[in-house]
Amino acid sequence: MNELDGIKQFTTVVADSCDIESIRHYHPQDATANPSLLLKAAGLSQYEHLIDDAIAWGKKNGKTQEQQVVAACDKLAVNFGAEILKIVPGCVSTEVDARLSFDKEKSIEKARHLVDLYQQQGVEKSRILIKLASTWEGIRAAEELEKEGINCNLTLLFSFTQARACAEAGVFLISPFVGRIYDWYQARKPMDPYVVEEDPGVKSVRNIYDYYKQHHYETIVMGASFRRTEQILALTGCDRLTIAPNLLKELQEKVSPVVRKLIPPSQTFPRPAPMSEAEFRWEHNQDAMAVEKLSEGIRLFAVDQRKLEDLLAAKL
């Protein structure tokens, strides 16, 4: 049995890609997207028809060019998502504009709009996850959206504090970023030789997974942002893992036994009182890595969102 099939015995595998052909090849349960992946896929000629449809939609649904570009971007994200849902049996994650990461109300408004666009294409709400950055405002937006039956994927998650706040808000799923945590520590104190058990990104997800299971939180833990297959194999047993095509390929090509590494702890504890905003901000601020990577992640997604807008604006 190859390693990918071995992992699938214990964990739901998700494709971290907007490349429809690539997703088709690896048979994942779900797929995740973000502005960077959308931008990459939009540059491929085989998806020109999805772009043309989004452009036509933008022209029809915006008065100014700026409004047309925003409308086209939203439609393009949904077009890709709807196509992906034709080949995955589960759900697809679609991201709210990163520039709204500190605006709860506008994040909610954008999320509702994206869901509405999906429903216009005949996609059920249950098959959509709305991705929001794990800021205080993003978590509060998700809390409200969950009450409306809109499931959310809280992304750019780097600290235990963010994970705890998400669970307390009752969000559907979180995406702790293994690789980006590893990158930060590796740049400051390189691990040589590499020991996966000491990988700070892997340890972070394990801690979150154990905490959630010990306190009976139903929020799904989906490890994300992997740099190497060792990180993925070390988290086998996690609820879900979202994996880029290059790593899916490596796992599919290697035949070796896969052992479950994450197992729910038998001991359970009562849940603590929910954190206040002040507690959240203070505790998160104590983690220099998380503060830096969250702000950087928001900036990078915003840059790619603008690039996507420029690409579409040139076609309007």
UniProtKB/Swiss-Prot annotation:
Compartments reported by the entry: Cytoplasm
Cytoplasm is among the record's keywords: yes
Biological processes per GO annotation: carbohydrate metabolic process; pentose-phosphate shunt
Domain of life of the source: Bacteria
Molecular functions per Gene Ontology: transaldolase activity
EC number: 2.2.1.2
Keyword vocabulary terms for this entry: Cytoplasm, Pentose shunt, Schiff base, Transferase
InterPro entries named among the record's database cross-references: Aldolase_TIM (IPR013785), TAL/FSA (IPR001585), Transaldolase_1 (IPR004730), Transaldolase_AS (IPR018225)
Listed PROSITE patterns: TRANSALDOLASE_2 (PS00958)
Chief location: cytoplasm
Transmembrane segments: none
One of the record's GO cellular component terms: cytosol
Active site (catalytic residues): 131
Catalytic activity: D-sedoheptulose 7-phosphate + D-glyceraldehyde 3-phosphate = D-erythrose 4-phosphate + beta-D-fructose 6-phosphate
HAMAP family named in the record: Transaldolase_1
The protein's assembly and partners: Homodimer.
Protein purpose: Transaldolase is important for the balance of metabolites in the pentose-phosphate pathway.
Stated name of the protein: Transaldolase A
Organism for this UniProt entry: Shigella flexneri
Species classification: Bacteria, Pseudomonadati, Pseudomonadota, Gammaproteobacteria, Enterobacterales
